[in-house]
Amino acid sequence: MSAAPLYPVRPEVAATTLTDEATYKAMYQQSVINPDGFWREQAQRIDWIKPFTKVKQTSFDDHHVDIKWFADGTLNVSSNCLDRHLEERGDQLAIIWEGDDPSEHRNITYRELHEQVCKFANALRGQDVHRGDVVTIYMPMIPEAVVAMLACARIGAIHSVVFGGFSPEALAGRIIDCKSKVVITADEGVRGGRRTPLKANVDLALTNPETSSVQKIIVCKRTGGDIAWHQHRDIWYEDLMKVASSHCAPKEMGAEEALFILYTSGSTGKPKGVLHTTGGYLVYAALTHERVFDYRPGEVYWCTADVGWVTGHSYIVYGPLANGATTLLFEGVPNYPDITRVSKIVDKHKVNILYTAPTAIRAMMAEGQAAVEGADGSSLRLLGSVGEPINPEAWNWYYKTVGKERCPIVDTWWQTETGGILISPLPGATGLKPGSATRPFFGVVPALVDNLGNLIDGAAEGNLVILDSWPGQSRSLYGDHDRFVDTYFKTFRGMYFTGDGARRDEDGYYWITGRVDDVLNVSGHRMGTAEIESAMVAHSKVAEAAVVGVPHDIKGQGIYVYVTLNAGIEASEQLRLELKNWVRKEIGPIASPDVIQWAPGLPKTRSGKIMRRILRKIATGEYDALGDISTLADPGVVQHLIDTHKAMNLASA
């Protein structure tokens, strides 16, 4: 592929930034040479009840993986996100809520949020929820979900937020794993004009006899829709709030006590309950939010994620609120009621920072200029990308069309397990290359290793590992530390293995090439699926592409590409040939697709992740081995892809 262009830091950005190039270099150097000194200083950004004396106590030795930060200090996360802001910014907006329906919105100040959190914390105590108990939150994107999270943190309960798109079976599995005592939900969720039967899903989940740990369901009224009611088990959120006291002293928590569990899919077996603790996580979420997004007091910050994912935890709730920011909470989807929704929300609420996913960017890009029709966009100062590698074509469209070539893009790489951003540009310090996550954040020491675990120097490609701990790192998998060690520390000993492949260029910039299990081996050549997808999407007629490997008699693996075309483009054999030649030209003959299947849509979770597992099964004709597809945003897409695949096989028979 052609050399990536470098977009230097704009002088006006460098002049006003929190972190210019010299500051980045000095801070990064200190953070890796003297992590104790660096993090001791950075930890002062939050309020401690009992100051810590110990900073970093960590071991990546696979016989004794142990991660502790600020272990003898005490604090309360809820107090750091609310109480400490009341004097200075009690009347500032903490949350701007934008409903699925554009006519619905709510503004909540820090003082109001503090009162609601205190009331609900008392309500939870009244339901026998205490320090160390697990509370499952299965809610739509409404302010009450944030209230529930902060109320748990206030009393020392551990929250487990389960994305509202998950099926009753998936919900039950997560409740069983953490032995949840209370489930907080809503009558229904609303998303993209459709209703989701959340309470009914909870009822179904609890028919599993192994969910007997659950004593109460607290139900928030979102739509007023009809729901089944269990007299001695179910309680209305609103009834609890009416009688609860608005005074609730925050519980003093040890820095290494659990704050939350968040379940993420394992490549095999049951979901992994990623465990994050209190002190290090909050320090890291707050620092990364401030420095990566160059956040200034009074700005409106919008992360489009759902609180059911780690991005919502760290960059809608904890990071922004710890920093006293105004955070926008969006219930809906980027294309409802139409594709201009994102740009309309930006203008309506004068959003300064927009942090979204490549899948949303590509959806807007497929509609071209129509996505920003009538938009002003002048409030925007910074753009961000999260969730998967962003292909250069989408990056350029985002930069030019949404950011008007004046907003830097922070292309962030991190994981549920990392707690916060690990590799990203800093707007005032880092020149940008479309598609590259660029350089490590403070305290993060990335490296590339070969399949034997040997470190690779210079410009190279390999397995991405992190050589030392950082405060936001997950401490374990809930109830299964052995699996934590096996998953992250056994593959390459003494290192945290991310599961991702990456390329490092001659400038030391990192390019994420995709999950290692998404790496193709074609005739002995390693190729990341992201690289081929980026080449395909760079074609003017392609909106989206997903690449999977299929068995090939000669090459070992063949390249199978699902392609979604831009609006108004007709599929044809001629276009199929054109796209194959295009990829040959962009990457080389070795990357030429063996099969291109037209796809009106791709199977995605509601957070926008493409489910490549399903695409692999369809490509190899394993239609009966697709597993649970209930968590997909549009399960109907799957049958369409199966039908198309069958028709292609018939045509070639």
Swiss-Prot record:
- Give its E.C. classification number: 6.2.1.1
Reactions the enzyme catalyzes: acetate + ATP + CoA = acetyl-CoA + AMP + diphosphate
Mind telling me which PROSITE patterns this protein's record contains?
Answer: AMP_BINDING (PS00455)
Q: Which residues form a coiled coil?
A: none
Q: Which residues bind ATP?
A: 387-389, 411-416, 500, 515, 526
The record's InterPro entries line, in alphabetical order, gives: Ac_CoA_lig, ACAS_N, AMP-bd_C, AMP-bd_C_sf, AMP-binding_CS, AMP-dep_synth/lig_dom, ANL_N_sf
CDD domains per UniProt: ACS
Q: Which UniProt keywords apply?
A: Acetylation, ATP-binding, Ligase, Magnesium, Metal-binding, Nucleotide-binding
GO MF assignments: acetate-CoA ligase activity; AMP binding; ATP binding; metal ion binding
Q: So which cofactors does this thing need?
A: Mg(2+)
The record's Pfam families line, in alphabetical order, gives: ACAS_N, AMP-binding, AMP-binding_C
Q: Which SUPFAM superfamilies match?
A: Acetyl-CoA synthetase-like
Q: List the disulfide bonds.
A: none
Biological process (GO), any one:
acetyl-CoA biosynthetic process from acetate
Provide the positions where the record notes the PTM N6-acetyllysine: 609
What does the UniProt record tell us about how this protein is modified after translation?
Answer: Acetylated. Deacetylation by the SIR2-homolog deacetylase activates the enzyme.
Q: Which residues are CoA-binding?
A: 191-194, 311, 335, 523, 584
Gene Ontology CC, one term: cytosol
UniProt record similarity statement: Belongs to the ATP-dependent AMP-binding enzyme family.
* Function as written in the Swiss-Prot or TrEMBL entry: Catalyzes the conversion of acetate into acetyl-CoA (AcCoA), an essential intermediate at the junction of anabolic and catabolic pathways. AcsA undergoes a two-step reaction. In the first half reaction, AcsA combines acetate with ATP to form acetyl-adenylate (AcAMP) intermediate. In the second half reaction, it can then transfer the acetyl group from AcAMP to the sulfhydryl group of CoA, forming the product AcCoA.
- By its UniProt entry, which NCBIfam families does this protein fall under? Ac_CoA_lig_AcsA, PRK00174.1
Specify the protein name.
Acetyl-coenzyme A synthetase 1
Record organism: Pseudomonas putida (strain ATCC 47054 / DSM 6125 / CFBP 8728 / NCIMB 11950 / KT2440)
